From Swiss-Prot:
Protein name from the UniProt record: NAD kinase
Residues noted as binding NAD(+) in the record, renumbered to the chain: D57, G58, N133, E134, R159, D161, T172, A173, Y174, N175, K176, S177
Active site: D57 (proton acceptor)
One GO term of the biological process aspect: NAD metabolic process
Cofactor section: a divalent metal cation
Species of the source: Streptococcus pyogenes serotype M4 (strain MGAS10750)
Listed GO CC annotations: cytoplasm
GO molecular function, one term: metal ion binding
Predominant cellular place of this UniProt entry's protein: cytoplasm
Catalysis performed (reactions): NAD(+) + ATP = ADP + NADP(+) + H(+)
Known EC number: 2.7.1.23
Enzyme type, top EC level: transferase
Protein function: Involved in the regulation of the intracellular balance of NAD and NADP, and is a key enzyme in the biosynthesis of NADP. Catalyzes specifically the phosphorylation on 2'-hydroxyl of the adenosine moiety of NAD to yield NADP.
Length: 279
């Protein structure tokens, strides 16, 4: 969905976030040198209007988590310095094009849904997180046994390695490698995908991905105490005695700068997984 922020006559505060690779540092250096002398821009990692991520999708995920509490004020734009990145609109040789587009920017943005996660521990503490791609729960040393509850109704008893819940944009990441479907981000939904489920005459699960609409909630209730590995995008945590994990579509969204160079979702999918098609 395209919307617009009001930037009329406003100096844009820009944060530049780059990984440690040589080419990323070169791109960052060029952007710094241009913006520091431009009266229409102010370089600051504090309260930015625009966050420029330089690297790949992993770098953009890190940038998202750096500013996940300011999503209503921030727009992101990605520059890829390696192979094509799913969230990036510019390659490293297109820096001049990015600078020109930002100078002409009127505040237009493309918005994608994100995932909200609430993890309840046996002592009553609740750990909350946001994910741009997905959140997974696994039990490494033993089979994970958990009830899957949708809108307070028990759907199935799961046995296997774990569960992944992804956003529409995250549907092209780990979810796809698990055999999940690719969802267009205008479909505000969550996707639950099983990780190596056990299915036989005794234990049964649906065995396919489930698409959950925005108004619905997913709950995962582990049936055994122990240590669980929980991944939120590119961050992994070891949590002991998890009693419940809840998943929702967040009220906030991630916003990307919309410009003539913004690549449509299906173009990104094609470039990432199919490439050029012979006519």
């Amino acid at each position: 969905m395209m919307t617009q922020m009001n930037y009329t006559g406003k100096v844009k505060r820009v944060a530049i976030i780059a990984n440690g690779k040589y080419q990323s540092k070169r791109v960052a250096s060029k952007l710094f040198s241009v913006f520091k002398d431009d009266p229409d821009f102010y370089l600051s990692k504090k309260n930015p209007d625009i966050v420029i991520s330089i690297g790949g999708d992993g770098m953009l995920l890190s940038a998202f988590h750096m500013y996940e509490k300011e999503l209503d004020k921030v727009r992101f734009v990605g520059i890829h310095t390696g192979h094509l990145g799913f969230y990036t609109d510019y390659r490293d040789f297109e820096v001049d094009k990015l600078i020109d587009n930002l100078r002409k920017d009127k505040g237009e943005q493309i918005s994608y849904p994100i995932l909200k996660v609430a993890i309840t521990l046996d002592d009553g503490r609740v750990v909350k997180a946001r994910a741009l791609n997905e959140a997974t729960v696994k039990r490494i040393e033993k089979t994970m046994v958990a009830d899957v509850i949708i809108n307070h109704v028990k759907f199935e008893s799961f046995r296997g390695d774990g569960i992944s819940v992804s956003t529409p944009t995250g549907s092209t990441a780990y979810n796809k490698s698990l055999g999940g479907a690719v969802l267009h981000p205008t479909i505000e939904a969550l996707q639950l995908t099983e990780i190596s489920s056990l299915n036989n005459r005794v234990f049964r699960t649906l065995g396919s991905s489930i698409i959950i609409p925005k108004k619905d909630k997913i709950e995962l209730v582990p049936k055994r105490l122990g240590i669980y590995t929980i991944s939120i995008d590119n961050k992994t945590y070891q949590l002991k005695n998890v009693t419940k994990v809840e998943y929702f579509i967040d009220d906030e969204k991630i916003h990307f700068v919309s410009s003539p160079s913004h690549t449509s979702f299906w173009e990104r999918v094609k470039d990432a997984f199919i490439g050029e098609i012979d006519s």
